[in-house]
Amino acid sequence: MSYIKKLRARLDSGEISAVELTKEYLAKIKEQDKRINSVITLCEAEALKEAEDADAIISAGKQGLLTGIPILHKDLFCTKGIRTTAASKMLDNFVAPYDSTVTKNCKDQGMVTLGKLNMDEFAMGSTNEHSYYGAVSNPWDLERVPGGSSGGSAAAVAAGFAPISTGSDTGGSVRQPASFCGLTAMKPSYGSTSRFGMVAFASSFDQAGIFAHYAEDVAIMLDAIAGECEFDSTCVGVKENHFTQDLEKDISGKVIGVDESLIKDLPEQIQEAVLKTLDNFKKLGAEIKSVKVPDLKEALSTYYIITPAEAAANLARYDGIRYGYRNPEARDLDELYRKSRTDGFGAEVKRRIMIGNYVLASSQYDSYYNKAQQLRKVMTDQINQIFTQVDVIFMPASPSEAFKKGDKLDPVSAYLSDIYTIPANISGLPAIAFPIGFANNLPVGGQLMAKAFNDNILTQMVVQYQKHYGIEEFILEQARI
C-alpha cells in the first residue's frame, strides 16, 4: 500500500502531469490551509518549475520512483533561495544560501517542493502552539492540537496537502504528531540521516523523519534521504534500500517486547486499541514477550536536562549580529544582544535556554548535567539489553489522543506528552509510530522501537501489519486521492 506508487502510475501513464498534480495540491493548500495554518511559506513558482522539469524527465523515460512526487518540508530544513524560519521571529527573514542534505536528496530524486511547514519554534514543544506564525489545528478536530514539534508536517499530510512531509524528531516530534493525526511516521536510527542544514535544537538527539499515511511510503522516503554526508560527522549512513529491503517478508517468529505496566494505566479506549494491536501481531505470527523498560519518568527528567543544555549552546549563535533578528533600538553591544534575543525568541525557547544555562553553570553541572549524561548511558545499556531477548519493543506513541488547544499551557503537563517517545531519542534507536485505533473518535497510535540500525525490521513489521489490517479508516476523506 503506497500513495507514492499510485501517483507514480498516474504520472507514468499520462493520466496526469507533474505540473497538473502540483497545481492540484497548491490549490488545495490555498483553499483549505486558512483553517489549519500548517504552511508557513508556499513555494508556488519554485514548485511549478520543478514540476516542469519532472515532466521533461518523465517524457524522456528517465524518471525514478519519486520523480514529480510533491513533498512539504518542515521549516527547519534549509532550502536554497527560500526562507527557513524554524517558526521563529529570530529567523523570519532568513534565506538559506544552500540546501540541507535532506532537501537536496529529495530534489536530486526529482521531487517537487510545495512549501515549508509550521512547527513549534526551534522544534521546542509538543503541541505546535509555540510558533511565531500561530498555532496549527488538527484536521480531525480544528479545536485540537496536531502534536509537536512537527505539527505542521502531520496536519498537512492528514489534510491531504501532500502525500509526504519531512519532520524532525528530538524527543518524539514525528511520532507523537503521527499518533494525534492518524499517520505513520518514523524516527530512524541516529546517524542514518544527515543533520547538515537542519536548524539545531539538541544535536545529540535531533534526527530527520518522515510522515505518510502508509509505512511503505515512509520506508521509500527514508531510503531517499538517508546515506553518508561529508558535512555531518555523526552521519554514518546506511546501505542502499536499508529501509525497504524486507517489506515483503512476513513477520512470523518476530518477538515483540511489551512492558505491561505501561499499558495498565492508559485510558480505557487506548488500552483496548493497544491490546487489539498486540493480538493482531500475534495473528501474523509474532510472539509477545514480557519485558521491563527503564523508568520513563527518569528518562523524561534526563531528556529535559540534557536537551535544554544543548539548546542553550546551539542558540547562542543568534545574537543579532551574525544573522537573524536584530533589534533596531539597541544603543550598545550589550543592549543589542539582550534586546535581539529577548524580542527574537518566544517564551518556550527562552524557558529552555534558561534551564540549559542553569544546568550548565559550574555550581550545578555535576548535580544535573553530568548525572543526566550518566543516566542516559545507563538507560541506553538497559534498553539494548532488552534487545538480546526481543526483536522490537512495543509502546503507545502517546498517553492520550489529541487534546484541545490551551489545555496544556503548563509546560510540565505538556512535557509529559513525550513520555513514551523519549527513550528512543535518549538511546539513538529507531522508532516508528502508526495508527492503531480511536479514542473519543480521534486517532491514537502505537510505536515500535528496535535496536540501532535495525530500522528495516520496523518498516517490515508495520508494512505487514497495514497490509493485513489496513488503515483506510485513518485517512480523512479530504486526504484521499
Swiss-Prot record:
The keyword Nucleotide-binding applies. SUPFAM superfamilies: Amidase signature (AS) enzymes (SSF75304). InterPro entries: Amidase (IPR000120), Amidase_CS (IPR020556), Amidase_dom (IPR023631), AS_sf (IPR036928), GatA (IPR004412). One of its GO terms (biological process) is translation. The keyword Zinc does not apply. GO terms for molecular function: ATP binding; glutaminyl-tRNA synthase (glutamine-hydrolyzing) activity. GO terms for cellular component: glutamyl-tRNA(Gln) amidotransferase complex. Its EC number is 6.3.5.7. The active site is at 74 (charge relay system), 149 (charge relay system), 173 (acyl-ester intermediate). Gene3D superfamilies: Amidase signature (AS) domain (3.90.1300.10). It is an enzyme of class 6 (ligase). Keywords: ATP-binding, Ligase, Nucleotide-binding, Protein biosynthesis. It catalyses: L-glutamyl-tRNA(Gln) + L-glutamine + ATP + H2O = L-glutaminyl-tRNA(Gln) + L-glutamate + ADP + phosphate + H(+). Transmembrane segments: none annotated. HAMAP family: GatA (MF_00120). Heterotrimer of A, B and C subunits. Allows the formation of correctly charged Gln-tRNA(Gln) through the transamidation of misacylated Glu-tRNA(Gln) in organisms which lack glutaminyl-tRNA synthetase. The reaction takes place in the presence of glutamine and ATP through an activated gamma-phospho-Glu-tRNA(Gln). Belongs to the amidase family. GatA subfamily. This is Glutamyl-tRNA(Gln) amidotransferase subunit A. It comes from Francisella tularensis subsp. novicida (strain U112). The lineage of its organism: Bacteria, Pseudomonadati, Pseudomonadota, Gammaproteobacteria, Thiotrichales.
